[in-house]
């Protein structure tokens, strides 16, 4: 879509034209389900000369919540590398302004859990600008059955919609009515 969302048609029966628009037939019309996926992660914006990665956000990921978070860098070649997001000058004992620094995408970076010390070392791994960075959602299911996770607010709905699409594909079933799925990249607004 124009706003970056994804509209998927799952097939199904043909939605019939409704003659009287004031009384749409719920039995014959198409169905649209939606979920938002506004907090997606980041991409590598730069492989720095010291082997660390500068980021650019995808969606509404605030830099101040990412400090010390574990992450995965997914290359376009299918390799996955782990790392940690940290402040550029992360030493509390050396950085006298540690507590005053506003965390933003200009002063946080990814330190890879690999033996790298230069941009060349990182590029040998296949990591480059545009590769995806996925942050650990820190998911936990409590004894009482609650699910706690970062970025959960509507990812669960997105997972349910994708699970339904997978179910239809794997079983070969076709819905009786036309079914659309819409994944928005904005908070509940499409």
Positions of PLM-derived features:
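N-terminal hydrophobic/helix-forming segments and targeting peptides
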Residues: 1-190
């Amino acid at each position: 879509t124009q706003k970056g969302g994804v509209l998927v048609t799952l097939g199904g029966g043909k939605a019939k034209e409704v003659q009287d628009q004031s009384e749409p037939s719920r039995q014959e019309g198409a169905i649209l389900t939606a979920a938002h996926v506004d907090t997606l992660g980041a991409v590598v914006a730069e492989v720095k000369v010291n082997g660390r990665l500068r980021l650019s956000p995808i969606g509404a990921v605030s830099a101040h919540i990412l400090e010390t978070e574990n992450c995965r860098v997914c290359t376009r070649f299918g390799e996955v590398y782990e790392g940690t997001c940290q402040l550029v000058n992360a030493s509390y004992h050396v950085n006298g302004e540690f507590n005053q620094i506003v965390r933003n995408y200009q002063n946080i970076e990814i330190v890879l859990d690999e033996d790298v010390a230069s941009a060349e070392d990182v590029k040998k791994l296949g990591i480059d600008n545009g590769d995806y960075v996925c942050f650990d959602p820190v998911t936990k299911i409590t004894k009482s059955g609650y699910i706690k996770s970062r970025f959960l607010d509507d990812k669960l709905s997105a997972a349910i919609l994708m699970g339904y699409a997978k179910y239809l594909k794997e079983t070969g079933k076709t819905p009786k009515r036309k079914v659309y799925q819409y994944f928005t990249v904005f908070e509940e607004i499409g």
